[in-house]
Amino acid sequence: MADTLLKCTTRHVRLFTARVDNDDLVPSANELTLDLDPDNEFIWSESCISQVQQRFKQLVDAAAGGELSDYTLRRIGTDLEGFIRQLLQRGELSYNPEARVQNFSMGLPRTPELL
């Protein structure tokens, strides 16, 4: 499997069975790479990034020992999408007003006027 690159792509999460080497993805059966919010739809604090990385580690650890498949990657990616939505709903994460597109893919911003 070392030559096969598996990937999962959701709106805000991209997962690869690879490591980054000189800005290139090198397939790896033993490593997962997380690309978070590639379209910069959100404004990320260090705390939010850390929380997503922690959740990613928990999900990877929980899947350890099992088959590394497209399905496993999709489950991890989908769970991370849900976690990002929770951060947004709690007000810990916010939409980036400078983003290329304002589509509010995870719901309208939670502001006092809208609550």
Curated annotation (Swiss-Prot):
Entry GO MF terms: oxidoreductase activity, acting on NAD(P)H, quinone or similar compound as acceptor; quinone binding
InterPro entries reported in the protein's UniProt record: NdhM
Pfam families in alphabetical order: NdhM
Catalytic activity: a plastoquinone + NADH + (n+1) H(+)(in) = a plastoquinol + NAD(+) + n H(+)(out); a plastoquinone + NADPH + (n+1) H(+)(in) = a plastoquinol + NADP(+) + n H(+)(out)
Enzyme Commission (EC) number: 7.1.1.-
Cellular-component GO terms for this entry: plasma membrane-derived thylakoid membrane
Topology in membrane: Peripheral membrane protein
Entry's localization field: Cellular thylakoid membrane
Predominant location category: membrane
Swiss-Prot/TrEMBL keywords: Membrane, NAD, NADP, Plastoquinone, Quinone, Thylakoid, Translocase, Transport
Summary of subunit composition and partner proteins: NDH-1 can be composed of about 15 different subunits; different subcomplexes with different compositions have been identified which probably have different functions.
Function: NDH-1 shuttles electrons from an unknown electron donor, via FMN and iron-sulfur (Fe-S) centers, to quinones in the respiratory and/or the photosynthetic chain. The immediate electron acceptor for the enzyme in this species is believed to be plastoquinone. Couples the redox reaction to proton translocation, and thus conserves the redox energy in a proton gradient. Cyanobacterial NDH-1 also plays a role in inorganic carbon-concentration.
Family classification: Belongs to the complex I NdhM subunit family.
Protein's UniProt name: NAD(P)H-quinone oxidoreductase subunit M
Source species of the chain: Synechococcus sp. (strain CC9902)
